[in-house]
Amino acid sequence: MNKIITIGREFGSGGRELGRRLAEELGFEYYDKEIITAIAEKTSMSQEYVQEVLEGKPHHLYPITIGQSMFIADNFYIQQEQSIYLAQSEIIRELAQKSNCVIVGRCADFILQDLKPFRIFVYADIESRIARCIERNSDAEKHLTEKEMKKQILSIDKNRAKYYDYYTGNKWGDKNNYDLCINTTGFVIKDIASVISKIF
């Protein structure tokens, strides 16, 4: 059976970097945004819409035809979102069965539970997360003030939790659902990856 590491994370905690570095240390395949591309291809939906759904954001990218009832529109969105989750599940299972791998987010810990993945959850205090987001200086974040950044971080986490809780029936971030919970506050992600890699 392949070795599988899944990583859930608070936004800005360094979970994505940890996953990438762990994969490098161990020689595992690394899957993150590639899953979004694969889902979009499988469902014939745009990558932008798929990402919005996976982040638990409101469904606003598909236009509603004038005259449609809200009931019909809601049913349409629900069906689209369920199709995305099913495609996500199929793709993640296919990837996990190919080789040893690290998978970031996407409810992978739940989807692969029968394959006994090593489930990690990464978190940090809000100040560290704000600092990390500012430091990486992405196009979407570089113009935000610290106050705006904090609001964005908390909003993203709320949406992730809502999506995860809805589809898994578990509580996002609950220590009972993970094998290892890591507080990255004050630590260098590269050093954490080096320590964790020794488990494998």
Place the predicted regions along the sequence by residue.
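Glycine-rich phosphate-binding P-loop
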Residues: 7-20
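Small-molecule kinase domains that catalyze NTP-dependent phosphoryl transfer to phosphate-bearing small molecules
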Residues: 60-65, 142-189
